[in-house]
Curated annotation (Swiss-Prot):
GO terms for biological process: phosphatidylethanolamine biosynthetic process. Heterodimer of a large membrane-associated beta subunit and a small pyruvoyl-containing alpha subunit. It is found in: Cell membrane. This is Phosphatidylserine decarboxylase proenzyme. The active site is at 88 (charge relay system), 144 (charge relay system), 247 (charge relay system), 247 (schiff-base intermediate with substrate). The gene is psd. It is an enzyme of class 4 (lyase). The record marks 246-247 as: Cleavage (non-hydrolytic). Its cofactor is pyruvate. Pathway: Phospholipid metabolism; phosphatidylethanolamine biosynthesis; phosphatidylethanolamine from CDP-diacylglycerol: step 2/2. The keyword Secreted does not apply. One of its GO terms (cellular component) is plasma membrane. It is a peripheral membrane protein.
Length: 282
């Protein structure tokens, strides 16, 4: 375990993330430009695909970080039966949900019920599929729909804010089931689908297209929002949310719906819109 990961056990997660949020939204020219220049240089951010490629134009660091891409920079897989990768990033893990458990790293796993904050909500995903995608600071930070769906419910699960970098994934037990997260439940033509937005150290917020800022809340209770009857339907490939810094999204699918795309594995670099899985059509 690295020193940084070890320190995250004792660091004041909330305080650091609150400070990061204040800096991310600062409109002080020197502050926001220093942040933009530092992150661009350190992580090799490529602005050539951004709708606004001039880093000086962004009013805040957060505006830069959640930047839109040029039209056509990402396109959905041409196969209409392909479920799509929800974001740019790197596969942390993917595979079957075996006996209700989701694989994190060698010797590490957690239950779907722990992740979703609800035993009953996890039942439809037993023996289904999961994919965990890590968004690094250089990546496009908007999350899109793998498949068309109607929003049924969101569940804000309070928790810690450990780093979600590779070393933490290998060494922090049940990492994604311990960090603060927003669970988004959708109804689709094949049944339920869940997209879980996992917060992390220095992540200053998660926003959804239907409700704006969802995290931070910094509460200590699970909070549910019922969207049944609201008619919030998002099409395949549509934007659904964004991270106001880097983090992780986990997609859960029920059994018998799709087969994972061949060639995908842990550590694979992926792009929004490429095939994650393909429908199993009788």
């Amino acid at each position: 375990m690295s020193l940084v990961t070890s320190l995250t056990y004792v660091l004041p997660h909330r305080l650091l993330s609150s400070l990061a949020r204040a800096l991310a939204y600062s409109k002080t020219p020197a502050t926001k430009q220093w942040l933009i220049d530092t992150v661009t240089r350190k992580f090799g951010v490529d602005l050539s695909e951004a709708q606004e490629p001039d880093p000086r134009v962004y009013p805040t660091f957060n505006a830069f970080f959640t930047r839109a891409l040029k039209p056509g920079a990402r396109v959905p897989d041409a196969d209409p039966q392909a479920l799509l990768m929800p974001a740019d990033g790197r596969i942390s893990q993917l595979g079957p949900i075996e006996n209700g458990r989701i694989f994190q790293a060698k010797g590490q796993s957690f239950t779907a019920a722990e992740l979703l904050g609800d035993e009953s909500a996890a039942v439809p995903f037993h023996n289904g599929l999961f994919a965990t995608v890590y968004l690094s600071p250089k990546d496009y930070h908007r999350v899109h729909m793998p498949w068309s769906g109607t929003l049924r419910e969101t569940v804000h699960v309070p928790g810690r804010l450990f780093s979600v970098g590779p070393d933490a994934v290998r060494n922090v037990p049940r990492l994604f089931a311990r960090n603060e997260r927003l669970v988004c439940h959708f109804d689709t033509d094949f049944g339920p689908m869940a997209s879980v937005m996992v917060g992390a150290l220095l992540v200053s917020g998660v926003e959804t297209v239907w409700s704006g800022v969802e995290i931070p809340r910094y509460g200590d209770r699970i909070t549910r929002k019922d969207y049944r009857g609201k008619g919030i339907t998002l099409e395949r490939f549509a934007e659904m949310a964004r991270f106001n810094y880097g983090s992780t999204v986990i997609v859960l699918l029920p059994p018998g719906v799709a087969a994972l795309e061949g060639g995908l594995a842990a550590e694979s670099s992926v792009r929004l819109g490429q095939a994650l899985a393909r429908r199993q059509v009788a």
